[in-house]
Amino acid sequence: MNTWNELTVHVNREAEEAVSNLLIETGSQGVAISDSADYLGQEDRFGELYPEVEQSDMIAITAYYPDTLDIEAVKADLADRLANFEGFGLATGSVNLDSQELVEEDWADNWKKYYEPARITHDLTIVPSWTDYEAKAGEKIIKMDPGMAFGTGTHPTTKMSLFALEQVLRGGETVIDVGTGSGVLSIASSLLGAKDIYAYDLDDVAVRVAQENIDMNPGTENIHVAAGDLLKGVQQEVDVIVANILADILIHLTDDAYRLVKDEGYLIMSGIISEKWDMVRESAEKAGFFLETHMVQGEWNACVFKKTDDISGVIGG
């Protein structure tokens, strides 16, 4: 009987995405996030904390490694690499690593206990694929299988991206999703009325996972998934481009985004830690965009830029 090692990292919430990616890089076959912020009794309002709910800055990220890997060596490697995160301006807090052994049957279902249906925005609720869930009036359901942890919709950067899509999509738009990951933003765009969505990711695994998630959601045949390096080689002009990726990468796509976004169209960017916000804003404005909306949740920033000659509705206009 095969066995697995379950490793849990207790880390500051700011480091969730970076640590999740690191766990996958070191051989984990999946990760699960346990975050007190996911259990608020009310809808998330992008930064407000409700006093009746006890909150913690620390989260638990649980990863699952096959027994063919030396878990002690993995833990030592992780400890060294996590220590380096502080040097890049990413606060990890007091990191704690715990591990235990699981048999195959435990692994098959254990990680699923971390995922429950989550109301992410006013209209959008993300539901694990194995859960029976009855939509309420006006509620749009995104079915997801978070097995490879490319983003399940609960991370602040994804939440703000979804909120921004709700803000700009009115129906009939064309959308490009750069670095689609799980495909959650593309699926949301389809549910919010976009006509055609083009989803790109450099990672072949992400392309496969995105397509699998898209296939779970009826009516999403208008999403076209392909491997791609940012916007290189893309010629399709669109109404909206959305990119939830690292700030250092975002600054390399703003010129191409301006070329591809139609007049009066939008560029949505997320995944920006606060210390790099000015750098991203300057890159977008230099390309020709005007800032319309700036959102902040904790140390994460997201923004909506507009390609327009009428600056009356933009920040500072």
Swiss-Prot record:
GO annotation, cellular component aspect: cytoplasm
Binding of S-adenosyl-L-methionine, residues: T158, G179, D201, N244
Subcellular location: Cytoplasm
Pfam family, one: PrmA
Main location group: cytoplasm
CDD domains: AdoMet_MTases
Protein purpose: Methylates ribosomal protein L11.
Name of the protein described by the UniProt record: Ribosomal protein L11 methyltransferase
Gene: prmA
